[in-house]
Structures are given as structure tokens and as C-alpha cells.
Amino acid sequence: MKSLLFTLAVFMLLAQLVSGNWYVKKCLNDVGICKKKCKPEELHVKNGRAMCGKQRDCCVPADKRANYPAFCVQTKTTRTSTVTATAATTTTLVMTTASMSSMAPTPVSPTS
């Protein structure tokens, strides 16, 4: 009986401490979701902090933007990752070509 009461007490404490995804705060008439950061495909609401608080932004999925076009702003994305990936690919190609030419008796021209 004591172990049953202890188990129930633990579950009741965990239900209060761990919210997980049981409650998601909504904003903009239940269209947006309050998050710390919006995904690149989601739209950021200009005055979302008034609805979600200081630490969170109101993020609206791109397919629901037509409902609230005046409030939504497209989030800025950077292309630094693409440039880095291109540079890494070029470096890999140069290294592969150099290692292939040192292994082969005659140099092989790379095809693009």
C-alpha cells in the first residue's frame, strides 16, 4: 500500500513539473504558436511579444499567412551555410583530384 501511495505521489509531481507538449500557448486567434525561435518556413508576427510574453515570439505557419497578411513578416534567412557547403565541396574535389593524380601513373583531367 505504501508503494502505491508513493507511486501516485511521484506521478502527481511529475504531471506538474513536466509539461512537455500537453499545453502549447497559441497566439493570433489560435493561428500562431508561441516559440523561442521561429522556423525559416514560419512567419514571425511583428507584435507577437505582446501576446506571448518577453521571451517568446508568435510564429505563424506559412500556409495560414493569408488569414493575417498585415501582421505577418517574413523571417530573414542567411545563405552562409550554403557558401560554407560550397567551399567544403570545392576543397573536397581539389583534395580528391590531387590524391587521384598522385596515385595514377598519368594525370587524369577532372570532368565537370
Curated annotation (Swiss-Prot):
Note the InterPro entries from the entry: Beta-defensin
User: Where, per UniProt, does this protein localize?
Assistant: Secreted
Secretion signal span:
1-20
Q: Where is this region: In vitro binds to LPS, mediates antimicrobial activity and inhibits LPS-mediated inflammation?
A: 21-63
Q: Which cysteines in this chain are paired by disulphide bridges? A: C27-C58, C34-C52, C38-C59
* GO biological process terms on file: defense response to bacterium; single fertilization
What does the UniProt record tell us about how this protein is modified after translation? O-glycosylated; glycans contain alpha(2,3)-linked sialic acids.
One cellular-component annotation, GO: extracellular region
| Superkingdom assignment | Eukaryota
Q: Which UniProt keywords apply?
A: Antibiotic, Antimicrobial, Cleavage on pair of basic residues, Defensin, Disulfide bond, Fertilization, Secreted, Signal
| Record family assignment | Belongs to the beta-defensin family.
Q: Give the PANTHER family listed for this entry.
A: BETA-DEFENSIN 123 (PTHR15001:SF3), BETA-DEFENSIN 123-RELATED (PTHR15001)
The free-text function statement in the UniProt record for this protein reads: Highly glycosylated atypical beta-defensin involved in several aspects of sperm function. Facilitates sperm transport in the female reproductive tract and contributes to sperm protection against immunodetection; both functions are probably implicating the negative surface charge provided by its O-linked oligosaccharides in the sperm glycocalyx. Involved in binding of sperm to oviductal epithelial cells to form a sperm reservoir until ovulation.
How does it associate, per the subunit comment?
Homodimer or homooligomer; disulfide-linked.
Name the chain's protein: Beta-defensin 126
